[in-house]
């Protein structure tokens, strides 16, 4: 069956960025964004997605325009693309909807300097978020982003004392025995042990064009021992020790070949309540997997097409 090319790379149906922003109007409205834009001969404003400074101002502007969030990023840190992060949040909304929860508590594993997932979850949905981060500079920026948006009542940024642990450090020190409804994670994609960690290709160039965006982020944010597969395997292992603390465990994956490896790892551990999805935004595709140790089947959510 041939898929409709028009919809092949479409975003989640509720993603506000399915309708492309009018960069010309936004450049008039936001001075800092205007200063990094390019003016075409037609008078239209264009955005150079391969320029890191431009991407930073674009992300900051879109967060302000669509969610009234005032966000800054640590120098050299990962610049989050809003469309992708929204796709992830919307997928979580879909899975949580059947539960009819009055209060939602989530964990953001590795929130980075932007703390974008926690900010979006809190601002958009009123979720209570625990943001875990191990890098000191990122922790400082994340806490400042929470403070400047007056979301301290909904978001706690927790400094991970040991980055080799996922939930362990927090759960061992947290006395209230809080239960969480989900965790999310954007793991380091690349294997730090590889001789060329950034040389891998996450796409099939014969079937899909290259992503437009320049790669951003520090080595610590982009690489870890064993890459994303090993990182998510650690989440799976810790999830088995915390079956009652988190209802739905999820993680994004940047490489399609990682998906069957994670599914096999879950199967080996007899975890069968599993669902997957794809996030499409422009020429970039990401994958995600969710699993639960509870008997209620996971909702697959709305697919991005």
Swiss-Prot record:
Record's catalysed reaction(s): adenosine in U6 snRNA + S-adenosyl-L-methionine = N(6)-methyladenosine in U6 snRNA + S-adenosyl-L-homocysteine + H(+)
Gene3D superfamilies xref list: Vaccinia Virus protein VP39 (3.40.50.150)
GO cellular component: nucleus
Entry EC no(s): 2.1.1.346
Chain residues that bind S-adenosyl-L-methionine: 85, 110, 133, 164, 186
GO molecular function: nucleic acid binding; U6 snRNA (adenine-(43)-N(6))-methyltransferase activity
GO biological process, one term: rRNA base methylation
Keyword Methyltransferase attributed: yes
Source superkingdom: Eukaryota
Keywords recorded for this protein, A-Z: Methyltransferase, S-adenosyl-L-methionine, Transferase
InterPro entries, alphabetized: DNA_methylase_N6_adenine_CS, METTL16/PsiM, METTL16/RlmF, SAM-dependent_MTases_sf
Region described as Disordered: spans on this chain: 194-217
Function of the molecule: RNA N6-methyltransferase that mediates N6-methylation of adenine of U6 small nuclear RNA (U6 snRNA).
Family note: Belongs to the methyltransferase superfamily. METTL16/RlmF family.
Name of the protein in question: U6 small nuclear RNA (adenine-(43)-N(6))-methyltransferase
């Amino acid at each position: 069956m041939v898929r409709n090319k028009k919809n092949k790379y479409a975003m989640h149906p509720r993603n506000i960025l399915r309708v492309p922003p009018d960069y010309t109007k936004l450049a008039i409205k936001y001075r800092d964004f205007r200063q990094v834009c390019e003016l075409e001969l037609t008078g239209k404003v264009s955005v150079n997605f391969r320029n890191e400074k431009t991407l930073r101002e674009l992300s900051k502007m879109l967060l302000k325009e669509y969610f009234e969030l005032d966000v800054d990023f640590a120098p050299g840190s990962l610049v989050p693309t809003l469309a992708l992060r929204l796709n992830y949040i919307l997928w979580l909304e879909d899975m949580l909807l059947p539960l009819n929860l009055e209060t939602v508590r989530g964990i953001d594993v590795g929130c980075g300097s932007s703390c974008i997932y926690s900010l979006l979850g809190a601002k958009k949905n009123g979720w209570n978020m625990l943001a875990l981060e191990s890098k000191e500079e990122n922790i400082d920026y994340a806490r400042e982003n929470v403070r400047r948006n007056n979301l301290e009542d909904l978001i706690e940024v927790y400094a991970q004392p040991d980055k080799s642990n996922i939930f362990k450090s927090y759960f061992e020190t947290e006395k209230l025995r809080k239960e969480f409804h989900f965790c999310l994670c954007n793991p380091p994609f690349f294997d730090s042990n590889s001789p060329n960690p950034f040389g891998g290709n996450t796409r099939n160039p014969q079937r899909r064009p290259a992503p437009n965006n320049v790669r951003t982020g520090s080595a610590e944010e982009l690489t870890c021992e064993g890459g994303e597969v090993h990182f998510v395997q650690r989440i799976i292992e810790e999830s088995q020790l915390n079956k009652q603390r988190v209802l739905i465990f999820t993680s994004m994956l940047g490489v399609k070949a990682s998906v069957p490896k994670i599914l096999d790892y879950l199967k080996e551990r007899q975890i069968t309540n599993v669902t997957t999805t794809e996030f499409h935004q422009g020429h970039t595709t990401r994958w995600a997997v969710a699993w639960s140790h509870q008997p209620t089947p996971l909702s697959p959510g709305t697919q991005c097409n």
